[in-house]
Curated annotation (Swiss-Prot):
Record's protein name: Ras-related protein RABA5c
Lineage of the species this protein comes from: Eukaryota, Viridiplantae, Streptophyta, Embryophyta, Tracheophyta
Species: Arabidopsis thaliana (Mouse-ear cress)
Entry's family note: Belongs to the small GTPase superfamily. Rab family.
Entries under SUPFAM superfamilies matching the protein: P-loop containing nucleoside triphosphate hydrolases
Induction data: By abscisic acid (ABA), phosphate (Pi) deprivation, cold, sucrose, mannose, and water stress.
Protein backbone atom coordinates (compact mmCIF):
# COMPACT_ATOMS: atom_id res chain seq x y z
CA UNK A 1 0.00 0.00 0.00
CA UNK A 2 1.39 3.40 -0.92
CA UNK A 3 1.84 6.29 1.46
CA UNK A 4 -0.94 8.10 -0.41
CA UNK A 5 -3.32 5.18 0.15
CA UNK A 6 -2.47 5.08 3.84
CA UNK A 7 -3.07 8.78 4.21
CA UNK A 8 -6.52 8.42 2.68
CA UNK A 9 -8.73 10.78 0.74
CA UNK A 10 -7.61 14.36 0.23
CA UNK A 11 -10.10 17.19 0.42
CA UNK A 12 -9.94 20.72 -0.94
CA UNK A 13 -12.45 23.21 0.46
CA UNK A 14 -12.88 26.76 -0.80
CA UNK A 15 -13.68 29.29 1.92
CA UNK A 16 -14.39 32.98 1.30
CA UNK A 17 -13.94 35.89 3.70
CA UNK A 18 -16.40 38.73 3.18
CA UNK A 19 -17.33 41.97 4.90
CA UNK A 20 -16.80 45.71 4.68
CA UNK A 21 -13.44 47.26 3.91
CA UNK A 22 -10.97 47.59 6.81
CA UNK A 23 -12.70 45.12 9.14
CA UNK A 24 -9.50 43.06 9.22
CA UNK A 25 -10.18 40.30 6.69
CA UNK A 26 -6.65 40.22 5.27
CA UNK A 27 -5.07 40.31 8.72
CA UNK A 28 -7.27 37.44 9.89
CA UNK A 29 -6.10 35.39 6.93
CA UNK A 30 -2.40 36.19 7.36
CA UNK A 31 -2.63 35.54 11.11
CA UNK A 32 -4.17 32.12 10.48
CA UNK A 33 -2.05 31.13 7.48
CA UNK A 34 1.34 32.60 8.46
CA UNK A 35 0.89 33.73 12.07
CA UNK A 36 1.71 37.28 11.00
CA UNK A 37 0.07 40.64 11.64
CA UNK A 38 0.79 43.88 9.81
CA UNK A 39 -0.69 46.92 11.59
CA UNK A 40 0.02 49.05 8.52
CA UNK A 41 -1.50 46.72 5.94
CA UNK A 42 -3.16 48.49 3.04
CA UNK A 43 -6.07 47.30 0.96
CA UNK A 44 -4.95 45.76 -2.30
CA UNK A 45 -6.90 45.23 -5.47
CA UNK A 46 -7.73 41.76 -6.69
CA UNK A 47 -8.34 38.43 -5.03
CA UNK A 48 -5.78 36.68 -2.88
CA UNK A 49 -5.90 33.27 -1.26
CA UNK A 50 -3.91 31.12 1.13
CA UNK A 51 -4.03 27.36 1.52
CA UNK A 52 -3.90 25.68 4.91
CA UNK A 53 -4.01 21.97 5.75
CA UNK A 54 -5.31 20.05 8.74
CA UNK A 55 -6.15 16.44 9.58
CA UNK A 56 -9.75 15.38 10.26
CA UNK A 57 -10.56 11.71 10.90
CA UNK A 58 -7.13 10.81 9.58
CA UNK A 59 -7.73 12.57 6.27
CA UNK A 60 -5.83 15.57 4.96
CA UNK A 61 -8.13 18.53 4.49
CA UNK A 62 -6.90 21.57 2.61
CA UNK A 63 -8.71 24.87 2.94
CA UNK A 64 -8.21 27.35 0.14
CA UNK A 65 -9.18 30.62 1.83
CA UNK A 66 -10.02 33.55 -0.43
CA UNK A 67 -9.81 37.21 0.55
CA UNK A 68 -11.52 39.93 -1.48
CA UNK A 69 -8.45 42.12 -0.96
CA UNK A 70 -10.16 45.48 -1.35
CA UNK A 71 -12.68 44.64 -4.07
CA UNK A 72 -15.58 45.32 -1.73
CA UNK A 73 -14.71 49.03 -1.80
CA UNK A 74 -15.86 49.06 -5.40
CA UNK A 75 -18.75 46.64 -4.89
CA UNK A 76 -17.02 44.45 -7.45
CA UNK A 77 -17.29 41.14 -5.64
CA UNK A 78 -18.93 38.93 -8.24
CA UNK A 79 -20.32 35.44 -8.53
CA UNK A 80 -16.89 34.22 -9.66
CA UNK A 81 -15.52 34.94 -6.19
CA UNK A 82 -18.19 32.79 -4.54
CA UNK A 83 -18.20 30.00 -7.12
CA UNK A 84 -17.39 26.66 -5.53
CA UNK A 85 -17.29 28.05 -1.98
CA UNK A 86 -18.37 25.62 0.73
CA UNK A 87 -17.55 27.89 3.67
CA UNK A 88 -17.70 31.60 4.48
CA UNK A 89 -16.56 33.95 7.21
CA UNK A 90 -18.64 37.13 7.38
CA UNK A 91 -16.55 39.71 9.22
CA UNK A 92 -17.44 42.97 10.95
CA UNK A 93 -15.44 45.33 13.15
CA UNK A 94 -16.77 45.49 16.73
CA UNK A 95 -15.69 49.16 16.92
CA UNK A 96 -17.72 50.25 13.87
CA UNK A 97 -21.45 49.62 14.03
CA UNK A 98 -21.89 50.36 10.31
CA UNK A 99 -19.87 47.25 9.45
CA UNK A 100 -22.22 45.20 11.63
CA UNK A 101 -25.29 46.78 10.04
CA UNK A 102 -23.97 45.77 6.61
CA UNK A 103 -23.69 42.09 7.53
CA UNK A 104 -27.18 41.50 6.13
CA UNK A 105 -26.14 42.74 2.70
CA UNK A 106 -23.13 40.44 2.68
CA UNK A 107 -25.27 37.49 3.71
CA UNK A 108 -27.76 38.29 0.94
CA UNK A 109 -24.95 38.37 -1.61
CA UNK A 110 -23.48 35.13 -0.28
CA UNK A 111 -26.86 33.40 -0.36
CA UNK A 112 -27.48 34.62 -3.91
CA UNK A 113 -24.23 33.27 -5.29
CA UNK A 114 -23.64 30.13 -3.24
CA UNK A 115 -25.27 26.90 -2.11
CA UNK A 116 -27.55 26.98 0.93
CA UNK A 117 -25.38 24.37 2.68
CA UNK A 118 -22.35 26.67 2.88
CA UNK A 119 -20.89 26.62 6.42
CA UNK A 120 -21.10 30.20 7.67
CA UNK A 121 -19.56 31.96 10.63
CA UNK A 122 -20.16 35.53 11.78
CA UNK A 123 -16.91 37.07 13.01
CA UNK A 124 -16.74 40.12 15.26
CA UNK A 125 -13.12 41.14 14.73
CA UNK A 126 -10.86 43.43 16.78
CA UNK A 127 -12.11 42.21 20.16
CA UNK A 128 -8.83 43.51 21.62
CA UNK A 129 -10.33 47.01 21.29
CA UNK A 130 -12.83 46.51 24.10
CA UNK A 131 -12.56 50.12 25.29
CA UNK A 132 -14.03 51.46 22.03
CA UNK A 133 -16.49 48.62 21.37
CA UNK A 134 -19.60 49.72 19.45
CA UNK A 135 -21.24 46.32 18.91
CA UNK A 136 -21.92 44.14 21.94
CA UNK A 137 -21.24 40.40 22.11
CA UNK A 138 -24.98 39.92 22.66
CA UNK A 139 -25.83 41.77 19.43
CA UNK A 140 -23.44 39.61 17.46
CA UNK A 141 -24.71 36.42 19.06
CA UNK A 142 -28.34 37.39 18.48
CA UNK A 143 -27.78 38.09 14.78
CA UNK A 144 -25.88 34.84 14.35
CA UNK A 145 -28.65 32.86 16.03
CA UNK A 146 -31.35 34.49 13.89
CA UNK A 147 -29.41 33.74 10.69
CA UNK A 148 -28.31 30.24 11.69
CA UNK A 149 -24.61 31.10 11.79
CA UNK A 150 -21.73 30.18 14.03
CA UNK A 151 -20.46 33.20 15.97
CA UNK A 152 -17.11 34.13 17.39
CA UNK A 153 -15.20 37.27 18.29
CA UNK A 154 -11.59 37.40 17.19
CA UNK A 155 -8.50 39.55 17.26
CA UNK A 156 -6.02 39.29 14.40
CA UNK A 157 -3.73 41.50 16.50
CA UNK A 158 -3.34 39.16 19.48
CA UNK A 159 -4.55 35.93 17.77
CA UNK A 160 -7.63 35.51 19.97
CA UNK A 161 -9.86 32.77 18.50
CA UNK A 162 -8.43 33.14 14.97
CA UNK A 163 -7.27 29.54 14.58
CA UNK A 164 -10.36 28.25 16.40
CA UNK A 165 -12.71 30.15 14.08
CA UNK A 166 -11.15 28.92 10.86
CA UNK A 167 -10.86 25.35 12.07
CA UNK A 168 -14.47 25.31 13.28
CA UNK A 169 -15.65 26.32 9.80
CA UNK A 170 -13.41 23.71 8.16
CA UNK A 171 -14.74 20.98 10.46
CA UNK A 172 -18.33 22.04 9.80
CA UNK A 173 -17.69 21.86 6.04
CA UNK A 174 -16.31 18.36 6.49
CA UNK A 175 -19.41 17.36 8.45
CA UNK A 176 -21.72 18.88 5.83
CA UNK A 177 -19.92 17.12 3.01
CA UNK A 178 -19.88 13.81 4.87
CA UNK A 179 -23.67 13.89 5.23
CA UNK A 180 -24.30 14.40 1.54
CA UNK A 181 -25.41 11.45 -0.54
CA UNK A 182 -22.96 10.62 -3.33
CA UNK A 183 -25.39 8.65 -5.50
CA UNK A 184 -26.67 11.74 -7.28
CA UNK A 185 -25.18 12.37 -10.72
CA UNK A 186 -25.65 16.12 -10.31
CA UNK A 187 -23.83 16.07 -6.98
CA UNK A 188 -20.95 14.05 -8.41
CA UNK A 189 -20.70 16.61 -11.20
CA UNK A 190 -20.67 19.41 -8.63
CA UNK A 191 -17.78 17.76 -6.83
CA UNK A 192 -15.80 17.52 -10.05
CA UNK A 193 -16.40 21.17 -10.90
CA UNK A 194 -15.45 22.35 -7.42
CA UNK A 195 -12.40 20.08 -7.18
CA UNK A 196 -13.57 18.79 -3.82
CA UNK A 197 -12.84 15.10 -3.13
CA UNK A 198 -15.38 13.63 -0.80
CA UNK A 199 -16.19 10.45 1.00
CA UNK A 200 -19.20 9.48 3.06
CA UNK A 201 -18.57 9.64 6.79
CA UNK A 202 -20.39 7.38 9.20
CA UNK A 203 -20.11 9.90 12.02
CA UNK A 204 -22.41 12.84 11.48
CA UNK A 205 -21.17 16.11 12.92
CA UNK A 206 -23.22 18.25 15.24
CA UNK A 207 -23.36 21.98 14.77
CA UNK A 208 -22.28 23.88 17.83
CA UNK A 209 -22.49 27.52 18.73
CA UNK A 210 -19.50 29.35 20.09
CA UNK A 211 -18.64 32.90 20.93
CA UNK A 212 -15.84 34.76 22.58
CA UNK A 213 -16.68 36.37 25.89
CA UNK A 214 -14.34 38.84 27.43
Amino acid sequence: MSDDDERGEEYLFKIVIIGDSAVGKSNLLTRYARNEFNPNSKATIGVEFQTQSMLIDGKEVKAQIWDTAGQERFRAVTSAYYRGAVGALVVYDITRSSTFENVGRWLDELNTHSDTTVAKMLIGNKCDLESIRAVSVEEGKSLAESEGLFFMETSALDSTNVKTAFEMVIREIYSNISRKQLNSDSYKEELTVNRVSLVKNENEGTKTFSCCSR
